[in-house]
Amino acid sequence: MTLHTKTSGVTLLHQIQGTELETLSRPQLKIPLERSLSDMYVETNKTGVFNYPEGATYDFGTTAPVYSSTTLSYAPTSESFGSSSLAGFHSLNSVPPSPVVFLQTAPHWSPFIHHHSQQVPYYLENDQGSFGMREAAPPAFYRPNSDNRRHSIRERMSSANEKGSLSMESTKETRYCAVCNDYASGYHYGVWSCEGCKAFFKRSIQGHNDYMCPATNQCTIDKNRRKSCQACRLRKCYEVGMMKGGIRKDRRGGRVMKQKRQREEQDSRNGEASSTELRAPTLWASPLVVKHNKKNSPALSLTAEQMVSALLEAEPPLVYSEYDPNRPFNEASMMTLLTNLADRELVHMINWAKRVPGFVDLTLHDQVHLLECAWLEILMIGLVWRSMEHPGKLLFAPNLLLDRNQGKCVEGMVEIFDMLLATAARFRMMNLQGEEFVCLKSIILLNSGVYTFLSSTLKSLEEKDYIHRVLDKITDTLIHLMAKSGLSLQQQHRRLAQLLLILSHIRHMSNKGMEHLYNMKCKNVVPLYDLLLEMLDAHRLHAPAARSAAPMEEENRSQLTTASASSHSLQSFYINSKEEENMQNTL
């Protein structure tokens, strides 16, 4: 680019102005110079005379009111907004020419002139009696510096925005699809995923697609091969945590959020109205407080993988029996051995139940009620699970393995033995996994006491709705495990139905075992331990009266009294175990 001196630059500008003014047939604008260009500043002791093309002459000075700060204005330029367009400037061809003043960087500026690093021409404007100064378009040899000016303005704009929220460019974080590692378009079905995987999962859960993997259910799913195997793609969707109801809480519609606020306000008003009732110390929590606390229960916010991990960690330790190989079995010795083992397992069962997600959120009444209804079913499914690897035998403890012939020494025990062995064979045929087992055991705990008999003398559960929600959460976890194993949708439905049918069979075995244990108690064959006796009496109380053959009225009355006392004793044992656990944690 040709370099120009200051004098030649002014001459060149005069030539440009003359060329433009010739098209309008107007005389050329002349600027009288009294000193060199490098020494020309706007000073307080200087006045200038400018000859306008129309022939009018105006005198002005910096001390005159025409340059007061109230009348001086700067018209915004297009470059102030980072644009290279010159549409914001008035050309000499579009408006009558105005006097031009060249301002150069100097140590003493007039206080109302904007600083620039280079010479910038300004036009004087006369608008409704007030004068203003507007920056003109820079000539071609100033264009390289305009990029720097735009850059500095952008920096000032960004620095001003730092006081508020960050810009979209700084806050936007690149996320990738959890299934195929493509760029994620948003948070869909509980995970960050792309549009393709979101649409595929939506089609899969809405339709009845029985995908089959042509290989070994281990296909690689990435951006380029995600369409090669639908079965493995759906399996990976479940593995990364996709679920039907997985939506972000902050993405709910305005109507949903409005209804939520209205419900919370109504709950707060109800809480204030009943504040006097809440101050009274009661054994059971108020239903209003329980309802409010269950909204944000941690158990309902767990993912499938988190639920499985929590259930596996909650598993109780193995309990050894007091079996003596040198002592032969008879009815009394075997029943004593088994009841002692069951009594010690009950203590671990209570600790296990308190670690099941959502169980401790229930009232004390509901916790005791569920344990009293399900304790023998839980013991039996644990026995069946341990016996899977021992065909024809039952592993009651690591040091107590019994077969069918050994069970014949106890009257009525063979029938129960056969049902337990058949259930273990069914588990073995289905290849039941440990994760599925812990889910089934938790379902038994929460489901056994939900449907109480109308003839039951005890109060029903207080938080059935919340228990059903936790049950749904565990059932969804069970379905997630089946989908993760690579089963088709039809196979998942079939396996889930088979497992739930086995639970009804375990319930039948529990009823048979309860009747047998109660008969042993009535015959005084074996003394029952305290906790086991309480559980037995409480379970008899939960059963309908029609199930007993012909019990006498006095026996029923005594049983009711014993069971009521047993229930209170179990509550005290439960509370004492809690206090002991809290004391251990404190120590």
Swiss-Prot record:
Using the UniProt annotation, give all residue ranges assigned to the region (Disordered).
248-277
Basic residues composition bias: residue spans: 249-261
Q: Which GO terms describe its cellular component?
A: cytoplasm; nucleus
**Biological process per Gene Ontology, one example term:** positive regulation of gene expression
Q: Which domain of life is it from?
A: Eukaryota
Q: Where in the cell is it found?
A: Nucleus
Pfam families named in the record: ESR1_C, Hormone_recep, Oest_recep, zf-C4
Alphabetically, the GO molecular function entries are: nuclear estrogen receptor activity; sequence-specific DNA binding; steroid binding; zinc ion binding
Q: Where is this region: Hinge?
A: 243-302
Ranges of residues in domain NR LBD: 303-539
Q: What is its main location?
A: nucleus
Residues of the DNA-binding region: 177-242
Q: Where is this region: Transactivation AF-2?
A: 303-587
Q: Where are the transmembrane segments?
A: none
What keywords were assigned to this record? DNA-binding, Lipid-binding, Metal-binding, Nucleus, Receptor, Steroid-binding, Transcription, Transcription regulation, Zinc, Zinc-finger
Q: List the disulfide bonds.
A: none
Q: Zinc fingers (NR C4-type) span which residues?
A: 177-197, 213-237
What's written under domain?
A: Composed of three domains: a modulating N-terminal domain, a DNA-binding domain and a C-terminal ligand-binding domain. The modulating domain, also known as A/B or AF-1 domain has a ligand-independent transactivation function. The C-terminus contains a ligand-dependent transactivation domain, also known as E/F or AF-2 domain which overlaps with the ligand binding domain. AF-1 and AF-2 activate transcription independently and synergistically and act in a promoter- and cell-specific manner.
Query: How does it associate, per the subunit comment?
Result: Binds DNA as a homodimer. Can form a heterodimer with ER-beta.
Q: What does the sequence similarity comment in the record state about its family?
A: Belongs to the nuclear hormone receptor family. NR3 subfamily.
Kindly provide the name given to this protein in its UniProt entry: Estrogen receptor
